[in-house]
């Protein structure tokens, strides 16, 4: 795994765009305090232009006014409906099928934390299923979506995993790194030598 840190400031957009051309995946950092800004949308357009699968990390969630639900709504409306909260995706994916979780939710008392967990699993799968017709068919037939299919949806820029945290306080970093490893696929390149030269 090789990470390339690009300048985020608008003055270095040209240098950043050159780096985009060699990426397999991108991580777009967004301030939880400021939300989606004009430059964020510019970067998003470039990522779309170069067809780069993208993860989002919403930073500074420790600051006053950082509202997770409001930020998710903004990401969906200003960037893509495919922006989905993956913070607890590993646990979600291990939570069983929708039929399993529906039964647990019906059996559980309304005040039971397990009921909220099972509802979250259902909602997560429903959001994923809404991003692709094949995923919807799989979800309706089996009550879940295989990890490999979710990875393909991310690679095809149909789904954009979102993680939340605070780099300053080291919150959410481990969850993001684990998720990045879990939900990415190795890219196969031809054995012949090739390079891109630019000035």
Regions found by a protein language model. Give the residues of each.
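Structural and coupling elements of P-loop NTPases
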Residues: 1-199
């Amino acid at each position: 795994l090789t990470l390339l840190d690009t300048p985020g400031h608008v003055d270095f957009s040209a240098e950043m765009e050159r780096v985009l051309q060699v990426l397999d995946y991108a991580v777009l950092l967004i301030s939880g305090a400021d939300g989606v800004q004009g430059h964020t949308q510019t970067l998003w357009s470039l990522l779309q232009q170069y067809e780069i699968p993208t993860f989002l990390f919403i930073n500074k969630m420790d600051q006053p006014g950082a509202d997770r639900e409001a930020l998710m709504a903004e990401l969906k409306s200003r960037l893509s409906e495919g922006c989905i909260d993956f913070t607890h995706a590993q646990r979600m994916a291990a939570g069983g099928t929708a039929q399993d979780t529906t039964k647990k939710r019906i059996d559980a008392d309304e005040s039971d934390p397990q009921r909220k967990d099972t509802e979250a699993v259902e909602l997560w799968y429903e959001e994923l299923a809404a991003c692709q017709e094949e995923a919807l068919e799989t979800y309706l037939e089996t009550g879940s979506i295989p990890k490999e299919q979710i990875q393909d949806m991310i690679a095809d820029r149909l789904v954009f995993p979102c993680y939340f945290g605070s780099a300053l306080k080291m919150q959410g970093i481990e969850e993001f790194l684990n998720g990045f490893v879990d939900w990415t696929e190795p890219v196969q390149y031809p054995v012949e030598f090739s390079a891109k030269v630019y000035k």
